[in-house]
Structure formats: structure tokens, C-alpha cells
Amino acid sequence: MEGTIVRIISNLCTVDCGGALYDCKPRGKFYHTNISPLVGDHVVIDDVNNYILDIKKRKNYLDRPSISNVDAALIVTSVKKPELSLSLLDKMISNVTYKDIEPIICFSKTDLLSFKEKLELRKIIKYYNKIGIKCTTNRKLGKITKLLDGKIVVLTGQTGAGKSTLLNKLNPSLNLKTDEISEALGRGKHTTRHAELFKYKNSLIADTPGFSALDITHIPKDELKNTFVEFNLDCEFKDCKHMNEKNCMVKDYVNAGKILKSRYDNYRKFVGE
């Protein structure tokens, strides 16, 4: 029987097999291969003796929290308190894209925007949608449900963006602790510790917003350009880094307004970090 590990406590793994839950222990062979089960693992189990017989090949995995086979990252992005930072947003998009995880942007606190600010946000949303990155707001639970359908999902985003609040909306039984923004620091506080997948409609969602996607130092500099999907253009040189090369189509598109200038500026900034 096959299923997905949704919880691990000590050496006991809870496996979801089509809605039926089995508490299983990994066979001893895993200890000799340095393979430890992770939440999100697709596994084969012996449902009679309650053993995990095999762990399927992982398509990706995260360290904190330890989750494998993540399909999508819901990037909760505050537009007020803390202020919208396209640099942080693009950094998180690059990070999850590099890990073969689909980025989905969820803007929060849009009710705090002025009319003019809402118009500017619409332009930003229109651009990200155009390059294939889906966007929503934390007030549209119906749309969020559709975007996450059938996927293993983690939440990420800057602290204070409302990740725990959104998780509590998706699953009120979680009753996750949320901290208000620190007035002095202008940022939120981390309040969650562990990871477990809970069922939401047809999706499995990590119950912790603790995944940090702000460190991109593990991405090789020459591969950063691949995490900016709209940079996939026919430049004169195949190995064009879109920095100082001549006849670079990416720079031409930026100058023509076809690529958002903040995206290109952030790319150059990340390469220099």
C-alpha cells in the first residue's frame, strides 16, 4: 500500500493512504543507508505489520522545516506593516524556483492600502501573472483553495506578513499562536516550531510557516538567471549573464518596459551578494 507521511513523532510515522491513517515504523534497513523518513515522503507500507517498506525518490526537500516533495510555496507577502518589499519577494521566488517548487504569491493586508496604492499593486500583480506566477490575496480563500488543489504546500514570507493567521483560517483547529508586529522593530516574531501536514480540501499543507526562503547563497551565481522565468530569451550569447554583455535581449526588454525594472535590478543585486 502506498501513501504520504504527514506526521513524524520520534520514530513513529503517520502515513495517509487515501484518507486512512496508519502509524508505521521504518524498517531497519533505512538506518544502514542513512535515509531517514521525512514528512512529505511518498512511501510503500506494510499495513498489516505497520512498517514502512520503501521510500520513493524525492523530487525535492527542505531542511527547515524538514519536508519533502513540496509542490508549491505560498509566499505570504505583506503590503503594509511591514511594507511591501519586492526585493524580498523576488528573493523568495528565486529560492523556491531553484528547488523546483512552484511559487504562488499571496498578498496580505491589502485593506490597509490607499486607492492609489491599490492601483500600483494591481500593476505588480498583472506583471507576475503575465510571467506565469500566480497571485492572490489572503482574503480570497476560494481562489487559494483552487491554486493549492492536489498539492503539498508550505507557507513562507517575511515575518509579520500573516502566515500563521492564514493557516488558522485554512485550519481553525491548529490554533497557531500569532504575534503582532513589534512597533519598535517593524517586523514580526517567529512563533512556530514543528512541521506536520494537514489535509485541506484536496491538498496537504505544512502547519508551520517557519520555512525561510531568504537565503539564496546556495544558488550558484550562473544559475540565478534561471530562477527569473522571464529571462529565458534568445540573447546573442548562449551563456549571457544579462549583466554587461552586448546585445542582451533581457536588457533590451527592460529598457522597453517588457520586463519589470525592479525584477532586473533585484537580479543584479542578488548576483552581487
What are these regions (language model features)?
Residues C13-C17, C24, I45, I52:
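SH3/SH3-like beta-barrel fold
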Residues L21-P37:
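Beta-strand/loop nucleic-acid-binding surfaces
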Residues D100-I101, G132:
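Glycine-centered short loops/turns at secondary-structure junctions
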Residues V76-L86:
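Short, glycine-rich nucleotide/cofactor-binding loops
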Residues M1-I9:
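Structural detector for short beta-strands of small beta-barrel domains
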Residues N11, N34-N49, K56-A73, S78, ...:
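Helix-rich effector regions associated with P-loop NTPase G domains
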Residues L112-A161:
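Canonical P-loop GTPase G-domain recognition
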